[in-house]
């Protein structure tokens, strides 16, 4: 029997909406990365973009365990000498919670050219509203261990 290779027309993309309220950031990122890559599908191929669209709402209410809120830092560099800036996650979640969630998910995607396409299917919103109701997204529940 020959190995099945999916064609671009065979890819069926769905829309999922995830509520990030009180969900641990790492668990949210790993589940979202699986959906974006399409690893939950039986027709998964690592060399193709098979993933679904993912909408994350309430990114401002995401949880971090332990002392990560104060100790974990996010770094950026402007490209100029001495242009390294860092901010802890408490300040990052207060100023731009969308960036904190996107950064965690981007770190769990493969480091190749497909990552940009897969990250393009991610829509993150700080509040409970999103403009994608016309796509009829399905609710995706993340099983949470008690904190």
UniProtKB/Swiss-Prot annotation:
One of its GO terms (cellular component) is cytosolic large ribosomal subunit. It comes from the Bacteria. The keyword Ribonucleoprotein applies. InterPro entries: Ribosomal_uL13 (IPR005822), Ribosomal_uL13_bac-type (IPR005823), Ribosomal_uL13_sf (IPR036899). One of its GO terms (biological process) is translation. It holds the Pfam family Ribosomal_L13. One of its GO terms (molecular function) is mRNA binding. Keywords: Ribonucleoprotein, Ribosomal protein. Part of the 50S ribosomal subunit. PANTHER family: LARGE RIBOSOMAL SUBUNIT PROTEIN UL13M, RIBOSOMAL PROTEIN L13. This protein is one of the early assembly proteins of the 50S ribosomal subunit, although it is not seen to bind rRNA by itself. It is important during the early stages of 50S assembly. NCBIfam families: rplM_bact. Belongs to the universal ribosomal protein uL13 family. This is Large ribosomal subunit protein uL13. The gene is rplM.
